Swiss-Prot record:
Gene3D superfamilies: Aconitase, domain 3. The lineage of its organism: Bacteria, Pseudomonadati, Pseudomonadota, Gammaproteobacteria, Cellvibrionales. This is 3-isopropylmalate dehydratase large subunit. Keywords: 4Fe-4S, Amino-acid biosynthesis, Branched-chain amino acid biosynthesis, Iron, Iron-sulfur, Leucine biosynthesis, Lyase, Metal-binding. InterPro entries: 3-IsopropMal_deHydase_lsu (IPR004430), Acnase/IPM_dHydase_lsu_aba_1/3 (IPR015931), Acoase/IPM_deHydtase_lsu_aba (IPR001030), Aconitase_4Fe-4S_BS (IPR018136), Aconitase_4Fe-4S_dom (IPR036008), IPM_dehydratase_rel_enz (IPR050067), IPMI_cat (IPR033941). Catalyzes the isomerization between 2-isopropylmalate and 3-isopropylmalate, via the formation of 2-isopropylmaleate. GO terms for biological process: L-leucine biosynthetic process. Its EC number is 4.2.1.33. It catalyses: (2R,3S)-3-isopropylmalate = (2S)-2-isopropylmalate. [4Fe-4S] cluster binds at residues 353, 414, 417.
């Protein structure tokens, strides 16, 4: 029998039946729900007279619309100023209460961003199929799981049947060997990958991340990388199970205990690609050559090393690409030949499902300790990804490091990653952001997003412009 990839194993374990059109019916182990893509799904169940098939497979929490300031959060749902946002959060509460679904509500200390809460509670585990009405559900693949985003109609299907019709994707291996240099993080690695293969490079593939760099990477780092597999065009990203995975999962609230843990661990240790597995495509990078990255344009593939200069569309031989570069430069207010380190920032956002875990908060705090936010920076905010992250950071005194630097410490939520709540950019403002998308208007109408690591964002908050974190740390 031919060797199988990690994705092959996860897929095969969950196929219920194969259909004549080449698609399969697959079983879903875990369903994560938030307030934005679930209301129509719950209403569809209600209209059809159906109930969720397995309420114990569902975990819900509001994240996109929740305010992140202490004053707003003190009033719970009533503190949400926007009426549409308030309705969405209240509707999630009502649906979960009615159907008996576990929900971490707005003032529950377990509330947070779905892609942070799932792994940290043990709600998402190795070997699972995991879905959520959110494209960044790929995050959970870092645990050795098959995890991907679905649409609202599919949310209803999974609630009703615990199954989903899907077509198997092709296999891609992205292998990064060598050792990362000082100041180079998981965020820089995934941005470098996207710069290399483009935002369509992973289309139709499930990506496995392998090689020396990922074997040495923390679970928080792996979660960051798999989170942005979708920005590389793939629906799912994943990393093989190893000791780092098992150490992370063990003891978490929903993780197996006692004899069940021993059985689960034995099974999970098989979740890796076989030595003779064949991938449809293999991409290789040298980790030692990756530098701290900064996005300059309006697509996650428009990324440069921090010591780079803004490209000139006149030097682009492909007319379509040249037009895209020109359009991006116009929107971003940048000029060809401008140094990345000469770009001034108006706001700084450290948070999102990409970079709001405790490792990210620690990295940012290390940079700003004993310093003060630049006067030219209008606002810098740090938004932990969950109540658990917030509590851990506060226990370590990290919140006080930020506030002493005139950087705001907030409540958990998606925040400035997307303009669906009160945290957003003004027109023309440049933001050093640890989020995952830099599309036009993503963080607010006319806002200009630069994707960076937490350390790079923190350094920009202090300096007022981008700096090479390697020099900062030397």
């Amino acid at each position: 029998m031919a060797g199988r990839t990690l994705y092959d194993k996860l897929w095969d374990d969950h196929v219920v039946s194969q259909r004549d059109d080449g698609s399969s019916l697959i079983y879903i182990d875990r369903h994560i729900v938030h307030e934005v893509t679930s209301p129509q799904a719950f209403e569809g169940l209600r209209i059809a007279g159906r109930k969720p098939w397995r309420t114990d497979s569902v975990i819900a929490t509001p994240d996109h619309n929740v305010p992140t300031t202490f004053n707003e959060r003190a009033s719970g749902v009533d503190g949400i100023a926007d009426p549409i946002s308030k309705i969405q959060v209240k509707t999630l509460d009502d649906n979960c209460d009615e159907l008996g679904i576990v929900e971490f509500k707005i003032n529950d200390n377990r509330q947070g961003i779905v892609h942070v809460v799932g792994p940290e509670t043990g709600g998402c585990l190795p070997g699972m199929t995991i879905v959520c009405g959110d494209s960044h559900t790929s995050t959970n693949g870092a645990l050795g799981a098959l995890s991907f985003g679905i649409g609202t109609s599919e949310v209803e299907h999974v609630l009703a049947t615990q199954c989903l019709v899907a077509k198997k994707m092709k296999n891609m291996l992205i292998k990064v060997d060598g050792q990362l240099g000082q100041g180079v993080t998981a965020k820089d690695v995934v941005l470098a990958i996207i710069a290399k293969i483009g935002t369509a490079g992973g289309t139709g593939f499930a990506i496995e991340f392998g090689g020396d760099v990922f074997r040495a990477m923390s679970m928080e780092g792996r979660l960051t990388v798999c989170n942005m597999a979708i920005e590389a065009g793939a629906r799912a990203g994943m990393v093989a199970v190893d000791e780092i995975t098992l150490d992370y999962v063990k003891g978490r609230a929903f993780a197996p205990k006692g004899d069940h843990w021993a059985m689960a661990e034995a099974r999970w240790r098989e979740l890796h690609s076989d030595a003779d597995a064949v991938f449809d495509e293999v991409v290789e990078l040298d980790g030692a050559q990756i530098k701290p990255q900064v996005s300059w344009g309006t697509s996650p593939e428009m990324v440069l090393p921090v010591d780079g200069v803004i490209p000139d569309p006149a030097q682009e031989s492909d007319g379509v690409k040249a037009a895209g570069v020109a359009r991006a430069l116009e929107y971003m207010g940048l000029t060809p030949g401008q140094k990345i380190t000469d770009i001034a920032v108006d706001r700084v956002f450290i948070g999102s499902c990409t970079n709001s875990r405790i490792e990210d908060i620690r990295a940012a705090a290390k940079v700003v300790a004993g310093k003060t936010k630049a006067a030219s920076v209008k606002e810098a905010i740090v938004v932990p990804g969950s109540g658990a992250v917030k509590a851990e950071a506060e226990a370590e005194g990290l919140d006080k490091i930020f506030t002493a630097a005139n950087i705001e410490w907030r409540e958990p939520g998606c925040s400035m990653c997307l303009a669906m709540n009160a945290d957003r950019l003004g027109e023309g403002e440049h933001c050093a952001s640890t989020s995952n998308r830099n599309f036009e208007g993503r963080q607010g109408y006319g806002g200009r997003t630069h994707l960076v690591s937490p350390a790079m964002a923190a350094a920009a908050a202090i300096s007022g412009h981008f700096v090479d974190i390697r020099d900062w740390q030397s």
